[in-house]
């Protein structure tokens, strides 16, 4: 969780693919701000400003104050970034307005810690990740950049369920059952193969 980052932008004329191409030819990255029951507005940004943000971890869980100068500021979350297939540079950004007074749905990445302290992994166990991100409902001010899962002490066969996780205060899973498996530590591939062969022989 962190404070909103200010990001400079300008209004741009027109909408649609033609207007977006014209914006890119002028050396800017086109974008749009929508949501919060207000009309969508078309914007343009310096590509260096965009790249400086998308290269950071947690871009899609970071709050932004999109600053349009005399045209006002908009509290937003980035919802989508289109990248050029050859140059891998940003060519369009979608921002969604949010209100501090209303809960939102957001997908938060899952990261794991203390893998080397897991007896199961030390024995050759394999960490199988079922959910790489979890969608939650929470206040915009309480969005976590990541959900950390501690693997310390976990043996082969251990499973981590959504109900085991500590979410931020006020946050709830969205459209995911509390009993859903987030990750598990499976036996080494060789061991599983030997077990299968033994069962087949028996």
From Swiss-Prot:
PANTHER family for the chain: RIBOSOMAL PROTEIN L25/GLN-TRNA SYNTHETASE, ANTI-CODON-BINDING DOMAIN-CONTAINING PROTEIN, RIBOSOMAL PROTEIN L25_GLN-TRNA SYNTHETASE, ANTI-CODON-BINDING DOMAIN-CONTAINING PROTEIN
Protein name: Large ribosomal subunit protein bL25
Assigned GO CC terms: cytosolic large ribosomal subunit
Assembly and binders: Part of the 50S ribosomal subunit; part of the 5S rRNA/L5/L18/L25 subcomplex. Contacts the 5S rRNA. Binds to the 5S rRNA independently of L5 and L18.
Keyword RNA-binding attached: yes
UniProt lineage: Bacteria, Pseudomonadati, Pseudomonadota, Alphaproteobacteria, Rhodospirillales
GO biological process assignments: translation
Family listed: Belongs to the bacterial ribosomal protein bL25 family. CTC subfamily.
